[in-house]
A protein has these predicted regions:
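N-terminal leader/targeting and accessory segments in enzymes
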Residues: 1-81
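Phosphate-binding loop of NTP-binding sites
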Residues: 7, 31, 56, 60-146
């Protein structure tokens, strides 16, 4: 989610987020980009955002999810956001599985990059060879860790 938040902020969209614990390197990544990350609280949504993205680890009982439902705020899942904001019209390479997704997705993005295809990518970690976990370009290619 942090990489997507950074990409949306680069597009000029106001972003904030919540989690029960964010640690380096992701906390550093967010801080460097000026993205606030707070503990879960319904008060985080008092300003009635245009869209609430609810992660797959969030369930009923979460104060922000409950507030979004009670206040009838627009909400979606991360996959829905990715589809509508980034993936439509792209040639997507989605890496799935139990182990090795980050490494494999990083390798695919690097191979496409070094073959001049300038891919977009969204990877759960921050690969050393790419320097960031997400990049959004005008390329037809998009590598995503699924």
């Amino acid at each position: 989610m942090a990489s997507v938040a950074a990409a949306l902020k680069e597009r000029g969209i106001a972003i904030s987020g919540s989690d029960s614990g964010i640690y380096p390197p992701m906390s550093t990544f967010l801080e460097e980009r000026g993205i606030a990350a707070n503990p879960f609280s319904a008060a985080n949504l008092d300003h009635k955002p245009d869209l609430v993205v609810i992660g797959n680890a969030i369930s009923r009982g979460n104060p922000e999810a409950e507030f979004a439902l009670e206040q009838k705020l627009d909400y979606c899942s991360l996959p829905e956001l990715l589809k509508h904001q980034f993936l439509l019209g792209k040639r997507s390479l989605v890496v799935t599985g139990t182990h090795g997704k980050t490494t494999t997705a990083s390798l695919l993005a690097w191979l496409l990059e070094h073959n001049g295809l300038n891919p977009s990518f969204l990877i759960g970690g921050i690969p050393n060879n790419l320097g960031q976990g997400a990049r959004f370009t005008d390329s037809d290619w998009f590598v995503i860790e699924g």
